[in-house]
Curated annotation (Swiss-Prot):
Species of provenance: Staphylococcus aureus (strain Mu50 / ATCC 700699)
Subunit structure: Heterotrimer of A, B and C subunits.
Keyword Transcription regulation: no
Protein name according to UniProt: Aspartyl/glutamyl-tRNA(Asn/Gln) amidotransferase subunit C
InterPro entries, per database record: Asp/Glu-ADT_sf_sub_c, GatC
Amino acid sequence: MTKVTREEVEHIANLARLQISPEETEEMANTLESILDFAKQNDSADTEGVEPTYHVLDLQNVLREDKAIKGIPQELALKNAKETEDGQFKVPTIMNEEDA
């Protein structure tokens, strides 16, 4: 069984900016131990003759060729807009200069 110390849990909590109680620290240590023990099962998997791969299925993206096509006229695109300005959509401000 992999032993996770109290200090390791506190360090992880600190990195995640979490404040946890001593009881939660103990519970997290036990939970992490269980997770690590479960993950160790991969060490005993027979991978002889198995090629390394990033995906379990031999699939690849099927993409269409990029082709430039004529878009819709500007007037039509802006036809149902609530507000326009200089030939563009005008939307409410969501950030002020202080946020930028």
